[in-house]
Amino acid sequence: MTPAERRAFERQLQQEFPGLELHAWYRQYRSLKAAHPDAILLYRLGDFYETFDDDAKLVADLLEVTLTYKEFASQKGRDQKQRCPMAGIPYHAVEGYVARLVGAGYRVAIAEQITETPSSRTDTRPRSIFAAGIEQTSLTGSNRMVERKVVRVITPGTIIESGMIPAERNNYLAALIADHGRIGLAYADLSTGEFAAVEFSGERAAQQAQGELTRLNAAEILVPDRADLRLPGLEPSSARLEQDLEFLTREERELLLPGERVARRVERENNARWAHGRVTAWPERRWDLRNAHDTLLHQFGVRSLAGFGLEDRPLAIRAAGAIVQYARETQQGVVANLRSIRAYTPGDAMFLDPQTQRNLELLEGASGTTRGSLIGVLDQTRTPMGARLLRRWVSQPLCDLTRLHARHDAVERFVTDAILRASVRETLRRVGDMERVVNRIIQGVGVATPRDMARLRDALRALPELVAALGDWTPPPGEIDLTGVRTLPPSAATDPVSLTENGNERIEPNQTSAVSLRAQREARRRVSARYADEDLFGEEEQNAPPVGSSNHAVGTQPSADDEASPVTAFVDDQATETLALDPCADMLAFLETAIDDEPPALLGASNYLRAGENGEPPRRVIRPGFEPEIDQVVAASRDAQRWISELEPKERERTGIKSLRVDYNRVFGYYIEVPKTYADQVPKHYIRKQTLTTGERYFTDELKRYEEIVEQAQQRLIDLERRAFARICDVVTGAGARLLRTARMIATIDVFAALAEAAVRGRYVRPELYDDTRLRIVGGRHPVVEQTLDETFVPNDIEMDTETRQICLITGPNMSGKSTVLRQVALIALMAQIGSFVPADAAEIGLVDRIFTRIGAQDDIATGRSTFMVEMTETAALLAQSTRRSLIILDEVGRGTSTYDGMAIAQAVIEYIHNEPRLGCRTLFATHYHELTDLERTLPRLKNYHMAATEQDGRVVFLHELRPGGADRSYGIHVAELAGIPQSVIRRASELLAELERRAPRSAPPTVPARGDDRRSAGRASSSGAGAARGEQGRTLPDGQLSLFDLAPGPVIEMLRRIDINQLTPLEALNKLHELQKLARAGGG
């Protein structure tokens, strides 16, 4: 705090607690809480992370822990104590509890102890996962209050702990900013180092940004605190008035029915959504272009962003800069693994809007899990990083024909070589999540754990076998994501961050580099000399190099007299683009010598002094022989313990006191106890320590020296272990570029092998891709449905193009499989463009740039949108955004309103897709409006299809076959019976249907003529004429069913409506009936 902030804070405490003397620890707690008022503060006290006041009540309720009370103040001049609510979390289980808090949408600040008391010096308990890398300092002077500070602020998008995020999914932090019709979007996964940015412009910017956010499914989204992004779900306080119409462009509004409006509805203020939801308001000054530009330059250690493709994308720069600053602030320091950024354009991949991603169930099924989704079928990966990469491929299909052919070649290699596929997949089981492990190590001791090093070593152990299995095969060029696979200038990775007076970040370079071998050797030489002088447990020498430093300046190379060793291969390593899988054999050799076989989970938990005693297995971080000083401290401590254990028999023999004993307690340490009866035989060099009723306790100078060696050994080993581990982290960081490149190449290999495995299991075929608009599928199957059926899946053929078969109009009964056919065509096209084989006997597919689906709908209560409004909004969007290369899937458009309105909209939509020169795209349209089948006569590129069904013994049998021509019946009553409708209802419905069909006229007028390509003006005339005709008489459906809603009002109908039956006498009723009969016979309808 600044002095002014400190004074304001003290005034606040005085006003809040008048007349109370606050305990020092509570003042410290409130000071830390004031700096992080929007976070739950976990305050380390002994074995627990404690929460107080309102935080304690919240934590006790959410985590179901005990709520207690603790004294925090006393009344001045009185013996009256004040208590506050308190709830604690055990330090050894903090990771799981924090994950639950963050999962509930809360920010969590971790306050750790950064100074130590004399008593804590002997505390050998391992620290928590959040405190392992903190270098504590000793209390000095009269200050006896342990200092604490917030070392991490954990938010949904900044989690890097492997146990707190799903292994198979990315944990994205996204940033979104809009300005003058343009939108900048950046996202990063701090656990993998992935960092990318894009900028959207034009009328479709909002829709494109929303689609990308849906694809990312970001854990947390940063927006400027005064943003008005106008994106659904990202409103800062209340819902917008007539929100849906404001999101639509003029063209989209013209496609909607006139007069349709969104209800004026205002949500109440929803601050919780910002404070605890996935949207986080970030101060607007953090989005300043100059500030963001400088932040990225320092982060990447470069002088220009041109090489990243960002120079002409100011909003992308601002979004990316906000992510780096937010990450630095929450991590309370640097974010070393964000080494580079990838700029991309919206057209690089197939566009999938949020509705399409949801309707096709690409990543989640109806249950909210991968069960029943496409990824649930295709994900046969063996590594978490492969699973994450496959998810990205599924949500970002390619539009690059060359890359797709290369992907299909790679999958085919694994399909045709079963031995290669099996051996590679078996080996991949042992690799684990190498990508996240390397990224954690790169971030240093504060993040990396000994188990991370062991996991990296175990992964590297599997690579020689993987390289041998692959032989000379390598992944296709361009498929390895090299974002961040470059050596980061150390200054960029370790710059401390501070704020200037105006709030902008100022970065002060701090020159560090990889570990100097000469410095290590010199340190070990000094250690040997000190051991000879028996000074292992003294203070560090003033000239000893600090952890993580070296004798090399930034950008320089080790001097020529640095001897070669396994470590030299990693210093100042530069990533080079090579397609061969690098097994990193030198790194494996280094880690084999540095890290013990079974290290503990955390630093400080090693059992160097107890390993091997009483059968206790070794549990050490540093392997014996790697760090001489650790070995020497262990040897010295064991020698001292041995000397102490042998002291008692020696002294008994030397003094003749048979009851003399050597013992230990925590208060007095080691002592020699002599009974009073032998007081005259005590040697003169014994020094009295304590007088007892039964005797005296003594010590000697020699015992005191060995006692100090034993007592200081454990803490000394903890310090040495932490420093050695930091040097190992530096070495791995120096090779980080190579390791990350290897990890990402393994992920790519894993994906190709997984797609091949899915192809073999599902009997998929390689699709043929073309740079045109054909779509021919022979024996196509739904990849998900066919795996869930107990019976054999019925395949279907479909053939389309934009010249002769542009629109397939599909009719048929309910439950006959119309929706399945629609979805399987879309999924086959999508699978082909991620590089997968497809479930079919053959497939020829012209590249699809966008897939739009309009399948199903439900009310959007939060924004006041009816089912029909949702349906029309989505339909308008796809009509406005589609191109000639798009694929449109429409299911039951128009069913959310009256029959005539719905059918009119459905026909108009079909005509628009068929006739609009900008469109003309491949379209599958399923409907129950059988009248629309007449459109085949007037729209030359529309073809009718139906789902076949037959009747056997009075029962309907769905054949699930797609056949040419329109359907003649819907079999709705049969479906109702299958759904469990009571039999009385079924019988009554059957009676009504038979009556309606009996009363239906035998002939029916033609449907409304469609607008063809060459009859736009004539179409308008015929359309208006049809409307007049429709007003004159009812209409019979093609399948013989009578429409209940087509009857136009005539004289008979009007007379019937005006009759008041209750006022008629029998004679008057008979006369009225006679009049009605005359009118009917005269044709008065």
UniProtKB/Swiss-Prot annotation:
Record-given protein name: DNA mismatch repair protein MutS
Function text: This protein is involved in the repair of mismatches in DNA. It is possible that it carries out the mismatch recognition step. This protein has a weak ATPase activity.
PANTHER family with a match to the protein in the record: DNA MISMATCH REPAIR PROTEIN MSH1, MITOCHONDRIAL, DNA MISMATCH REPAIR PROTEIN MUTS FAMILY MEMBER
Gene Ontology molecular function terms on file: ATP binding; ATP-dependent DNA damage sensor activity; damaged DNA binding; mismatched DNA binding
GO BP term (any one): mismatch repair
Residues that coordinate or bind ATP: 812-819
Gene3D superfamilies per the UniProt record, alphabetical: 1.10.1420.10, 6.10.140.430, DNA repair protein MutS, domain I (3.40.1170.10), MutS, connector domain (3.30.420.110), P-loop containing nucleotide triphosphate hydrolases (3.40.50.300)
UniProt feature, compositional bias: Low complexity: 1019-1031
Species, as recorded: Roseiflexus sp. (strain RS-1)
Record-linked InterPro entries: DNA_mismatch_repair_MutS, DNA_mismatch_repair_MutS-lik_N, DNA_mismatch_repair_MutS/MSH, DNA_mismatch_repair_MutS_C, DNA_mismatch_repair_MutS_clamp, DNA_mismatch_repair_MutS_core, DNA_mismatch_repair_MutS_N, DNA_mismatch_repair_MutS_sf
Family: Belongs to the DNA mismatch repair MutS family.
Keywords, alphabetical: ATP-binding, DNA damage, DNA repair, DNA-binding, Nucleotide-binding
Biased composition regions of type Polar residues, renumbered to the chain: 548-559
Residue span of region Disordered: 533-564, 997-1042
Family annotation (PROSITE patterns): DNA_MISMATCH_REPAIR_2
Pfam families tied to this protein: MutS_I, MutS_II, MutS_III, MutS_IV, MutS_V
A Gene Ontology term for the protein's cellular component: cytosol
